[in-house]
Amino acid sequence: MPGGKRGLVAPQNTFLENIVRRSSESSFLLGNAQIVDWPVVYSNDGFCKLSGYHRADVMQKSSTCSFMYGELTDKKTIEKVRQTFDNYESNCFEVLLYKKNRTPVWFYMQIAPIRNEHEKVVLFLCTFKDITLFKQPIEDDSTKGWTKFARLTRALTNSRSVLQQLTPMNKTETVHKHSRLAEVLQLGSDILPQYKQEAPKTPPHIILHYCAFKTTWDWVILILTFYTAIMVPYNVSFKTKQNNIAWLVLDSVVDVIFLVDIVLNFHTTFVGPGGEVISDPKLIRMNYLKTWFVIDLLSCLPYDIINAFENVDEGISSLFSSLKVVRLLRLGRVARKLDHYLEYGAAVLVLLVCVFGLVAHWLACIWYSIGDYEVIDEVTNTIQIDSWLYQLALSIGTPYRYNTSAGIWEGGPSKDSLYVSSLYFTMTSLTTIGFGNIAPTTDVEKMFSVAMMMVGSLLYATIFGNVTTIFQQMYANTNRYHEMLNNVRDFLKLYQVPKGLSERVMDYIVSTWSMSKGIDTEKVLSICPKDMRADICVHLNRKVFNEHPAFRLASDGCLRALAVEFQTIHCAPGDLIYHAGESVDALCFVVSGSLEVIQDEEVVAILGKGDVFGDIFWKETTLAHACANVRALTYCDLHIIKREALLKVLDFYTAFANSFSRNLTLTCNLRKRIIFRKISDVKKEEEERLRQKNEVTLSIPVDHPVRKLFQKFKQQKELRIQGSAQSDPERSQLQVESRPLQNGASITGTSVVTVSQITPIQTSLAYVKTSESLKQNNRDAMELKPNGGAEPKCLKVNSPIRMKNGNGKGWLRLKNNMGAQEEKKEDWNNVTKAESMGLLSEDPKGSDSENSVTKNPLRKTDSCDSGITKSDLRLDKAGEARSPLEHSPSQADVKHSFYPIPEQALQTTLQEVKHELKEDIQLLSCRMTALEKQVAEILKLLSEKSVPQTSSPKPQIPLQVPPQIPCQDIFSVSRPESPESDKDEINF
């Protein structure tokens, strides 16, 4: 039944408890199997006494006990031990180790791997036995003669078990090894549990006290107990002899069931005083024999079988009938299970009503026994007419008759009528009603009636009048417990807490309640005065003060001051006491249970009873960050003291502070991070090293041609960037646009060309074309007459300086010019020839001053529309008449000139572009061929470098630069060749 679970039944890791319990007289270590050098995570007191080391000194040392090696330790044995750890094997060794005081001792060392639920080896268990008396590594005077014999005799008498284990040591190597393997197998099957979370397991043939079968069985026993409580008083009072076979069989079956219950009680778990579930068969049997066994056995004797015989003496039959009352002791079963039944509200009400009816039944049996005893006077053999039985017989018409032949009184009411009348009287008396048709007349009857009325008034007032008060007073803690559980369940359901976390919360509440019994310790301590509160706190923390040597020199006042500051917390399995990164603000003492310290998903320490973890606050000035997680493996009781409270006490008791700082040793300091390497990481590094070793390394020397080539490219790029930064180039534009004139006329059949030029860049990377090339470019600009009514078109020519946008050379320049022509097509329709010529005749102001600053070497050569040939008019003086919108927004001071271009010039330009494009392709092909040769030479050199050099290195082949193909552009400036410049130039 879920509500009837009593005890701590949550899954927990009881590995450490099992090892300690099964190896209580052994010395052992636990090492982490997943960290390099297998550091020690736990050592028991036996090993500390055997080696002379403190537990804190042994922690994080190698499980191979390398810190105990000495000069006489066998190297081969050391290697075998390491191989056993490396291969995760089980093995045994005889090894010579040294104690802390450097005393050599022979140990019989057993190594066994511990696996988790995934069958992965996570820990190593190393057990040690002292065999120095049987193998002396050093021969001295004390080991000779009778002294050695006396020591050997004393050892044999004190440790016979050790002798039995070490008997095969003097045999051959084969037999010795076989016996060791047998011990390891026995160790692994019997002693070694798995390191995992698991529910409490019960041994075979043991029944859990809260399982469904045992719950059903308890309810059956409850019903049969009430049957016994009803029938036994009835049979004793009315002196019925079980002549009815059916009733006899039924009573016998009930007796058999109670006998079976006795057997089951020898195999049923129970809850210990600390809330733990006791499943050890020996403890269960001893507990039952000391408590309820005798009572249950007396209540199960078959008294009805004796009464069933015909020729049994009346006295003996009456005696055994009276002994049936002993069966009422079976009500103790109800008392011991009452806390189970009280889990249900309806069951409580039914039990109370049954108790009231059962008391009335018992009183009715007693009332009839009094009347039956007084109705006939055995001395005079006369009937008492004032008895309530005689009055009842007269009232119902069944009077008593005297049988003269037999000399006895006969007749009277039947037994059924007598029982009903007795129960009627007791019920009316218990409920304080009393109709009076059946009334006591004799003194004994009146005295019993008075007692019954007193009991009845108490029962009636208690059960029916104050049921709510009874529950509030008797079961206040239980009601509060169930109220808390209901609130927690509603909270978990409202906020949809995951199932796993919900189970942890419920288990923690149940376990905490079982430990504290619902008592608020702080509330109780607040009621007590200061002195009494300090005494109670010292008593509550007595385990901490008695077990740790750091508190031995503390005075009574110091202990009382510390005890008041201590807090006791209860942790369930899986609870995290510290998270990695949290502030360590408390010092924790483990009183019971076990915990694990996890750093980087590896167990670096296992803490048990008597261990201390936290931080050394008395030596540090700042709060520490927890470097690992501390998680409970089992139900744990921790006594903690906060940092501020501890420092306050230490500051006040300075003498104790020195002793405390010197004697308290932390088993695990959460401030210091443990440096370790995982075995898996080491294996990965080894695999990576082997992989890199097998790979061919491609290393290019400093004087390699490839390095020199890229270094040359880098230098050229730096020089080009430096030259561009020193100069302030200006963009020139050749732009043809249609401009409206004042008279609204338009220029037809002409093309207007705007020519401008910037100052050439004077760097080592570029040079200006010769005047012949410039003149040739100027002669190419000729006037073409438009065909028919063709619209005037303008050609936009960019600067001769080659930019990275690709507008300065070849067919790409023509493409951009045509794009600009299409964009300005709408404006050209409104420009007339007269307007164009008018623009040419205007002389803007300030042209002379501007010409003095900037000189344009270009001149107008031909103008078919104006009839002027070989004009000396400078182009840079004819651009002032245009509107401000025609000027470049970035270069407002650049002068513009206009002249018409014939249509044949466009064809000439196309031919030139075609020729230039062909030259560019040829140049690109030559450069690609040269690059292919260079790459082939590089690969050849690299392949030669990968082979070991046995002879002198071959001379390097110089890189050949392909011949430069002359390429001319109309408005272009050449520069040194480089990969980047080629990329910029050939970007189409």
From Swiss-Prot:
<keyword id="KW-0832">Ubl conjugation</keyword>
<dbReference type="InterPro" id="IPR005821">
    <property type="entry name" value="Ion_trans_dom"/>
</dbReference>
<keyword id="KW-0812">Transmembrane</keyword>
<keyword id="KW-0597">Phosphoprotein</keyword>
<feature type="region of interest" description="Disordered">
    <location>
        <begin position="721"/>
        <end position="741"/>
    </location>
</feature>
<feature type="topological domain" description="Extracellular">
    <location>
        <begin position="368"/>
        <end position="419"/>
    </location>
</feature>
<feature type="topological domain" description="Cytoplasmic">
    <location>
        <begin position="1"/>
        <end position="217"/>
    </location>
</feature>
<dbReference type="Pfam" id="PF00520">
    <property type="entry name" value="Ion_trans"/>
</dbReference>
<feature type="region of interest" description="Calmodulin-binding">
    <location>
        <begin position="704"/>
        <end position="715"/>
    </location>
</feature>
<comment type="similarity">
    <text>Belongs to the potassium channel family. H (Eag) (TC 1.A.1.20) subfamily. Kv10.2/KCNH5 sub-subfamily.</text>
</comment>
<feature type="binding site">
    <location>
        <begin position="550"/>
        <end position="668"/>
    </location>
    <ligand>
        <name>a nucleoside 3',5'-cyclic phosphate</name>
    </ligand>
</feature>
<dbReference type="InterPro" id="IPR014710">
    <property type="entry name" value="RmlC-like_jellyroll"/>
</dbReference>
<dbReference type="InterPro" id="IPR018490">
    <property type="entry name" value="cNMP-bd_dom_sf"/>
</dbReference>
<keyword id="KW-0472">Membrane</keyword>
<dbReference type="GO" id="GO:0006813">
    <property type="term" value="P:potassium ion transport"/>
</dbReference>
<dbReference type="GO" id="GO:0005251">
    <property type="term" value="F:delayed rectifier potassium channel activity"/>
</dbReference>
<feature type="topological domain" description="Extracellular">
    <location>
        <begin position="313"/>
        <end position="319"/>
    </location>
</feature>
<feature type="region of interest" description="Disordered">
    <location>
        <begin position="838"/>
        <end position="893"/>
    </location>
</feature>
<feature type="transmembrane region" description="Helical; Name=Segment S5">
    <location>
        <begin position="347"/>
        <end position="367"/>
    </location>
</feature>
<dbReference type="InterPro" id="IPR003949">
    <property type="entry name" value="K_chnl_volt-dep_EAG"/>
</dbReference>
<feature type="transmembrane region" description="Helical; Voltage-sensor; Name=Segment S4">
    <location>
        <begin position="320"/>
        <end position="340"/>
    </location>
</feature>
<dbReference type="GO" id="GO:0005516">
    <property type="term" value="F:calmodulin binding"/>
</dbReference>
<feature type="topological domain" description="Cytoplasmic">
    <location>
        <begin position="341"/>
        <end position="346"/>
    </location>
</feature>
<dbReference type="Pfam" id="PF13426">
    <property type="entry name" value="PAS_9"/>
</dbReference>
<feature type="topological domain" description="Extracellular">
    <location>
        <begin position="239"/>
        <end position="243"/>
    </location>
</feature>
<feature type="domain" description="PAS">
    <location>
        <begin position="14"/>
        <end position="86"/>
    </location>
</feature>
<feature type="transmembrane region" description="Helical; Name=Segment S3">
    <location>
        <begin position="292"/>
        <end position="312"/>
    </location>
</feature>
<feature type="modified residue" description="Phosphoserine">
    <location>
        <position position="883"/>
    </location>
</feature>
<dbReference type="InterPro" id="IPR050818">
    <property type="entry name" value="KCNH_animal-type"/>
</dbReference>
<dbReference type="GO" id="GO:0044877">
    <property type="term" value="F:protein-containing complex binding"/>
</dbReference>
<dbReference type="GO" id="GO:0005249">
    <property type="term" value="F:voltage-gated potassium channel activity"/>
</dbReference>
<keyword id="KW-1133">Transmembrane helix</keyword>
<keyword id="KW-0325">Glycoprotein</keyword>
<feature type="short sequence motif" description="Selectivity filter">
    <location>
        <begin position="432"/>
        <end position="437"/>
    </location>
</feature>
<feature type="domain" description="PAC">
    <location>
        <begin position="91"/>
        <end position="143"/>
    </location>
</feature>
<protein>
    <recommendedName>
        <fullName>Voltage-gated delayed rectifier potassium channel KCNH5</fullName>
    </recommendedName>
</protein>
<dbReference type="InterPro" id="IPR000700">
    <property type="entry name" value="PAS-assoc_C"/>
</dbReference>
<keyword id="KW-0406">Ion transport</keyword>
<keyword id="KW-0851">Voltage-gated channel</keyword>
<feature type="compositionally biased region" description="Polar residues">
    <location>
        <begin position="723"/>
        <end position="741"/>
    </location>
</feature>
<keyword id="KW-0112">Calmodulin-binding</keyword>
<dbReference type="InterPro" id="IPR003938">
    <property type="entry name" value="K_chnl_volt-dep_EAG/ELK/ERG"/>
</dbReference>
